[in-house]
Each structure stands twice: as C-alpha cells, then as structure tokens.
Regions:
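A secondary-structure micro-motif
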Residues: 1-78
C-alpha cells in the first residue's frame, strides 16, 4: 500500500529508509520529490497488515535511528 506525506524539510531522508509505527517497522520510503517551492512529498510502501491501524488523521515525522543513524519516518496517532 502506498502512503504519502508532505514535509517542509526531509533532513537527509533517502529512498529505502525505514517507516515505523508504534515502534514497529511497517515499510520503507519509496520515492521523494518536490511538489512546489517549499514542500517535499515522501511516498512510502506500507505493509498491508499495518494499514488498518493508520488513520487518516495520523501524523508523520522524520527522526533518526540512534544518535547518528539513518533517517526514518515515524507515523504516530490516528
């Protein structure tokens, strides 16, 4: 399943980085592209089994794995 999120800054996020929800890896970043002068759209591949828990009002943020680790997308709430 594909899920999209808009960010003002992706801070070094790359295609292939992990997507987490409630402390569990549920997918990976599929594509990153500009949508206008100030926003970047991140397309994610999400495991179908996880989609029932992610609501339309969920939020996505970019974090790091560990102190100097890879970037990741964290989906919360919903």
């Amino acid at each position: 399943i594909h899920v999209n999120a808009l960010f003002d800054n992706v801070g070094g996020l790359k295609v292939g980085n992990n997507v987490w929800f409630s402390g569990v890896k549920i997918g990976t970043v599929r594509r990153i592209h500009f949508v206008n002068n100030s926003q970047v759209e991140v397309e994610m591949n999400i495991q179908e089994s996880a989609t029932e828990f992610i609501r339309k009002d969920a939020t996505a943020s970019i974090s790091s794995e560990g102190f100097i680790g890879n970037k990741l997308v964290v989906i919360a709430g919903g």
